[in-house]
Each structure stands twice: as C-alpha cells, then as structure tokens.
C-alpha cells in the first residue's frame, strides 16, 4: 500500500493546492491566468499582453508531459 510519508505528502499537497485555489478565487485576477482546455487556451486577467504563443505551447506541452 502507501507508506505514512506518502500519505502525509499527498495530504499536504492537497491542502496547499486548496489554499492556493482559494487565494486565487478571492483575488480579482491580479495576474494573467491561462486555462488550457483540449486544443485551446483562454487568457484571463491582467498583463496577458506579454505572453506569446510559444509560452502557452510550452505550458501545454509541460502539462501534457505531466499527464503521461
């Protein structure tokens, strides 16, 4: 099964992710958020003008690599 360290690490990672998501939803988009869905990307927030298509493609490739 899983060791105590693995369970603790999973629980802490989940807690930190929930805290970050709560913080991001509480602030009114102070930064540019990229939502990658399928073959498209939606940019929301401020300072999105500085992002290039290469940056979005790199993020998409990184996430695709994490899924595999």
From Swiss-Prot:
The keyword Transmembrane applies. Residues 27-68 are cytoplasmic. One of its GO terms (cellular component) is host cell endoplasmic reticulum membrane. It comes from the Viruses. The chain crosses the membrane at residues 7-26. One of its GO terms (biological process) is transport of virus in host, cell to cell. Residues 1-6 are lumenal. Keywords: Host endoplasmic reticulum, Host membrane, Membrane, Transmembrane, Transmembrane helix, Transport, Viral movement protein. Pfam families: TGBp3. It is found in: Host endoplasmic reticulum membrane. InterPro entries: TGBp3. Belongs to the Tymovirales TGBp3 protein family. TGBp1, TGBp2 and TGBp3 seem to act together for cell-to-cell propagation. TGBp1 is the main movement protein that physically cross the plasmodesma with the viral genome. TGBp2 and TGBp3 would facilitate TGBp1 function. Plays a role in viral cell-to-cell propagation, by facilitating genome transport to neighboring plant cells through plasmosdesmata. May induce the formation of granular vesicles derived from the Endoplasmic reticulum, which align on actin filaments. This is Movement protein TGBp3. It comes from Papaya mosaic potexvirus (PMV).
